Structure formats: structure tokens, C-alpha cells
Amino acid sequence: MADHNDRGRQGEEIALKHLRQQGYQIEALNWQSGRRELDIVASTSRELVVVEVKTRTEGFLLAPEEAVDARKRRLISESAHHYVRMYAIDLPVRFDVISVVLSADGSCKRIEHRENAFPLLLKRSQRSTPRRRRL
């Protein structure tokens, strides 16, 4: 398996441990439906938390969280929308990003959990209520 896949899996394990220590309930890991995928789906008593995990090795030019661009945020939003509809979840959804930086030996150098990293982004056709047009 490619090093980046191993690194990604290691970052997800570190993120899972962090979330559990913070009291989150893990609902799904690497949830997939068609081409849709969510790294981690967790929950609190008040909300569903969709977590995108980005892992890099120390010295990588791009910070992990910078890899979650507008296109990626939209895909995550669409996947979360599908997850919520599929399981009839009636909780607000929050999108977090966990950035993991590994040292050369593979140990965790830094972990950063950014809550409310971005809002729900959907295409108009996926919105449950149409927007009103101004006259």
C-alpha cells in the first residue's frame, strides 16, 4: 500500500483517539455511499459532527487543513446531506477538520481540531426548501 494511504490511516486513528477523549460518540468511519465518503461521523448529545481528517508529514509545504478547498467542502457537504437523509437524522450538522502532522518517525507532532470549519454547502437542487426570489 502507498505511504500516503498508511499515513492517512494513521492520522485517522489519531483523530479517532482525540475525538473519543473529548467525549464524542463515533457513528461511522470511512462511510461510503457510491462515490461519496466521509472520514469520520461522530456525534454529541446536541449535534452530528462530520470530520475531515488531513494528515501530513512535518516539513510538507501545504498545511493539512489547506487541502480542504471549496470543492472538497462541497463534496463533504453533499455526502453529509446524503448520510442525514439515509439515516433520518434530526440533529444539526457541524463540519470539523482535524489536521495531523507526523514527524519523520511517524509519531504525532501536532494535532489541531478546528470545529465549525465550514458551513453546509449544497447545490440548489439538493436544498430542501427553495430560495425565495426577490421581485
Curated annotation (Swiss-Prot):
Organism per entry: Porphyromonas gingivalis (strain ATCC BAA-308 / W83)
PANTHER family: UPF0102 PROTEIN YRAN (PTHR34039:SF1)
UniProt similarity note: Belongs to the UPF0102 family.
InterPro entries to which the protein is assigned, alphabetical: Restrct_endonuc-II-like (IPR011335), tRNA_endonuc-like_dom_sf (IPR011856), UPF0102_YraN-like (IPR003509)
GO molecular function: nucleic acid binding
SUPFAM superfamilies in the record: Restriction endonuclease-like
Pfam families named among the record's database cross-references: UPF0102
Disulfide topology: none
The name this protein goes by in its record: UPF0102 protein PG_1874
